[in-house]
Amino acid sequence: MKVVPSEKIKPNWWRETSVYQIYPASFKDSNGDGFGDLEGIISKVDYLKALNVESIWLCPIYPSPLKDMGYDVSDYKQIDSRYGTLEDLDRLMKALHERDMKLVMDLVLNHTSDQHEWFKESRSSKTNPKRDWYFWKPARYNEKGERLPPNNWRSYFDTSAWEWDEATQEYYLHLWSVGQPDLNWETPKVREAVHDILRFWLDRGVDGFRLDAINMISKDQRFLDAPITDDRYEYQLAYQYYANGPRIHEYLNGIGNILTEYDAFSVGEMPYVLDTNEILHVVGADRRELTMIFQFDFVDLDLDPNQHKYIEGSWELSDLKKSLKKWQSALLSGGGWNASFIENHDQTRTVSRYLSDSPKYRAYSSKLMALFIIFQSGTPFVFQGQELALANIPRDWPIDEYLDVETQNFWKLFMSGNPSQEEIEKTMDIVNKRARDNGRTPMHWDSSPNGGFTKAGVKPWMRVTNDYKEWNAANQVNDPESPYTFWSKALELRKELKDAVVYGSFELISEEDPSIVAFVRESSTYKLIILLNFTGNKVSYDCPLNLTSYEILLDNYKDFICMTSPVTLNPYQAVLLKL
């Protein structure tokens, strides 16, 4: 069924833009310390402009102890010296704005670092004025008199979500690491401080924000025990109590009112939201909350039913189609807006995870994902290296090369159970497939030592993957057949055909086909068909539309023939057609 856009969807720059996500530590090191920096990003602005992306999202670059690579912020109004200075950020902003590009900052508002002055004050005494800026609770005790956390919530890093503070004899809440205490948004002064941070950056010229874990800021104040859904663990995921809590829309409206004043972009990270109506309450055109959100249906397709990433799950193409239809239909017709993504700093490389990173099909797979992401309704997000078909960490790397706190905490917990060698190998297979580290390895700029990320002889903060000599930017930017060129052309066509791609209708066709994802984007000016073979097999496809009069705009094999059905699609073939 064709889904027609709601009349509430009006032209706006953030609907028409495309966003390139930069993980600064791994993008480009300019000074030879092995750590990416703002000067390195500035040196690659023209590379990004040529890719045809129009907005740049920077992962956190604020001062931080780096317990969670910058998502533990110790000062919201400064730049970490590893990355540069406020003046360097101003120069980056100037370089982008001169090229009609935008800058989006990453704001972490659910929690701070335990080194933030707010938390230092809060933990200093029970009577400190900032004590209620965080969640502090007394201990529970079992029948043996042993001290227990206030409830059984598990952090995202597989420990208790509560940490004991010896000095004040209470626990504080941390949904992430012990170094990331959760802010208490119930306290009005916390909200005032957050609003001040937003205005600080907007007044400086920033064009918008990605808001980390933003649906965690309102929590059920009863702090009930979570149901036991995974009996392997003492502590349990409790998202029903800390995600999308009772005051979430009040808090988001406070943020949205400020963003609206500046016509600013906002995308909220909102895991555990499956109800499209709940999302429309956030991103509806008349809601004044956020402009779009990241929902996780696509990237959670292969998780087990309890959403534990290190248990092997499975997925079918029909699952992806159901999700695509659900979100495209609900938000387009309901006056909301999608953020179209499948890779980021918390996910793995899609050529490895969902398609094929074999030498034969890797480039084709990357190009397929370009059409899938870019031609949906919504604002497309490209993660650094995705345009180069970068793949996951090699399977033979030892666990010591995986530096992420999530991976290390999981492995420590797993090994504490004295697993067999067979269990270790099987679990390592899953870690290699799912670990966040996969998206965080340094960029491949050229075939020089360290892939051009940093100088020869310098040890980068994280190891560069082995295949940088074959898969790098220098090899691709001038190659008309490369993944980079294909992504660039697709992004350029999105701009040229915005009547259909940005503001047109959406229709999923051939819903029962087990191999092909096919959809139509249409306006009064254009009719586009996107055909994607998600399998490693050559497929005969019976298209319900007569393709004989269509023009081929993009084809990752350059051999598609517009003819009456059935048509043939090669393994991982992706075709964009225009009537």
Swiss-Prot record:
Q: Which InterPro entries does its entry note?
A: Glyco_hydro_13_cat_dom, Glyco_hydro_b, Glycoside_hydrolase_SF, O16G_dom_2
Q: Identify the keywords attached in UniProt to this record, alphabetized.
A: Glycosidase, Hydrolase, Maltose metabolism
Annotated catalysed reactions: Hydrolysis of terminal, non-reducing (1->4)-linked alpha-D-glucose residues with release of alpha-D-glucose
Sample GO molecular function, one term: oligo-1,6-glucosidase activity
- Expression induction or repression: Repressed by glucose and inositol.
Q: Where is the active site?
A: D212, E269
A single cellular component GO annotation: nucleus
Q: Which GO terms describe its biological process?
A: maltose catabolic process; polysaccharide catabolic process; sucrose catabolic process
Q: What is its EC number?
A: 3.2.1.20
> Where is the site Transition state stabilizer?
D346
> Which PANTHER family does this entry report, sorted A to Z?
ALPHA-AMYLASE FAMILY MEMBER (PTHR10357), NEUTRAL AND BASIC AMINO ACID TRANSPORT PROTEIN RBAT (PTHR10357:SF179)
Family, similarity comment: Belongs to the glycosyl hydrolase 13 family.
**Protein name, please?**
Alpha-glucosidase
- Gene behind the chain: mal1
